[in-house]
């Protein structure tokens, strides 16, 4: 069943990449569609990086940028995940996949509809299962992370990053002004409090505490003042910068469960509760 079910994933950031990784490892053909200049921060573990670099490998799964949908089969033939610049999602209508996953984490619906595919899955707040999609995956850290919601919504956006060793808002690096980012440190580098991590439009971006630079937006991406451009991890474990997070894998597991249990994809009379009857 898996090899016959094309899944289009909108977005290739680090959380979306946890989804792509889970699906690819389970044998599903996946197409990632992205912006011309993706806003991914944790680029070392984001399949969106293929847009900039041509290729990226995350924990043994390689993604390749393709120019058009006609190159999907070529990428799949060598075990690679195709990544297509398709900000408007035109490939969804052209390919008519059985599954669409909106993994852009925009905290609002950017136009995804239940009519996009037989199974449409939204990640996090901004979607209503049963209205604009078939299932929602909880993305908020805590007891319900990764849970499949068949009716209703995920927990609301708190506007606050998850706490890591007591650090929350201050672990996020933001652009002090509009411009492009000139990095002075690389992802995985150790940083010290007050050290300059990058420059934006001639203004310095400082490390808020000792740790490692877990993510930094690509230098070709124009940024506005206040935009999230980086992430410092106080745990200081370099390996974490290059491996998929527990959160991303939990969300990916939720998407995998939703696909495998959706009756519109796998009719199984008497196999258990229908999705609409499952607890949210």
Predicted regions mapped to residue ranges:
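Well-ordered secondary-structure scaffolds
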Residues: 2-280
């Amino acid at each position: 069943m898996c090899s016959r079910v094309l899944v289009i994933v909108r977005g290739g950031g680090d959380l979306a990449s946890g989804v792509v990784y889970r699906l690819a490892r389970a044998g599903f053909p996946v197409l990632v569609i992205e912006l011309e200049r993706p806003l991914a921060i944790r680029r070392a573990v984001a399949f969106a990086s293929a847009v900039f670099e041509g290729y990226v490998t995350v924990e043994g799964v390689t993604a390749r940028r393709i120019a058009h949908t006609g190159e999907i089969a070529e990428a799949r033939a060598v075990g690679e995940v195709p990544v297509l610049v398709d900000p408007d999602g035109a490939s969804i209508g052209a390919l008519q996949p059985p599954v669409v996953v909106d993994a852009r984490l925009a905290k609002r619906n950017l136009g995804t509809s239940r009519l996009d595919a037989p199974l449409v899955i939204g990640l996090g707040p901004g979607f209503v299962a049963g209205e604009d999609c078939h299932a929602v995956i909880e993305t908020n850290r805590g007891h319900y992370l990764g849970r499949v919601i068949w009716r209703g919504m995920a927990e609301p956006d708190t506007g606050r990053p998850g706490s890591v060793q007591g650090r929350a808002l201050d672990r996020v690096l933001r652009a002090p002004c509009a411009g492009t980012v000139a990095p002075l440190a690389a992802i995985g580098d150790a940083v010290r409090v007050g050290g300059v991590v990058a420059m934006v439009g001639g203004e310095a971006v400082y490390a808020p505490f000792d740790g490692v630079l877990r993510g930094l937006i690509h230098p070709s991406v124009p940024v506005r003042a206040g935009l999230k451009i980086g992430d410092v991890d106080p745990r200081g474990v370099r390996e974490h910068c290059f491996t998929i997070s527990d959160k991303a894998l939990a969300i990916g597991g939720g998407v995998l469960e939703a696909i495998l249990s959706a009756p519109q994809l796998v009719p199984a009379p008497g196999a258990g509760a229908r999705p609409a009857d499952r607890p949210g």
